[in-house]
Amino acid sequence: MVTSFKDDDYVVFPLIPYSPLETDLISTDEKSTAKHILGTDGTGRDIMSRMIHGSRVSLSVGFVAVGISLTIGIILGALAGYYGGWVDNLIQRLIEIVICFPTFFLILTITAFLPQNIFNIMIAIGIVGWTGVARLVRGEFLKLRSQDFVTAARAIGTPASRIIFRHILPNGLAPVFVSATFGVAGAILVESSLSFLGFGVPVPTPSWGQILSDGRTNYEMFVTLYPGIAIFLTVTSYNLVGEALRDALDPRLKI
């Protein structure tokens, strides 16, 4: 059964029993009950519904932002590693300019100048977080561009774009997968921090960081507890996946 509500597309029943925007002034600041499993906040909104909906927002920001940073980082890193010379120098200087600013401060500055919506948050995180991916891809290309299969491809006149994206890139993606898992965790933390400070997902759309901020503002301990636990467990899980992928894919750790 699918039901719709204001400022959202859909919710899936019964996972989200109430609209995350629905208020019930009779049931404000309730603890856990049969009707409201995780209780309600100061305006009577069901915390469980807001948490489930907030997970979609926070995870969407994480995945899309990492997708943007991977796209930028892979393209620029591949060009720098394959061509070298002035192309490499130009991209390296661009990377140095970006990383000379504190990451969170740069993202906060970008979001302050953009209209406040979830897509601009994804873009801001994505266009700042690509430098690590670019360096990883560049390093892999520097190692692989002198291999025999690349030399053979050049000898038969294969276009550079095909060599880069069809021959070299698939052989150098292993460290990128590891970086992506850490990137998702980092993006979720950044989005939560932005929402906590009031620069994230616009009100009233719930995200974990915004729920955390609401609980702090109204001095509601249990409202802050649940999103805090969710953020901690999600970020820890992605970091553990990243560690496992690194252990499995990095040949240097098998020596």
List PLM regions with ranges.
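Generic hydrophobic transmembrane alpha-helix motif, especially the helices
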Residues: K35-D41, R45-I47, S58-Q147, P175-F177
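Transmembrane alpha-helices
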Residues: R56-I72, L142, S161-S193, Y238
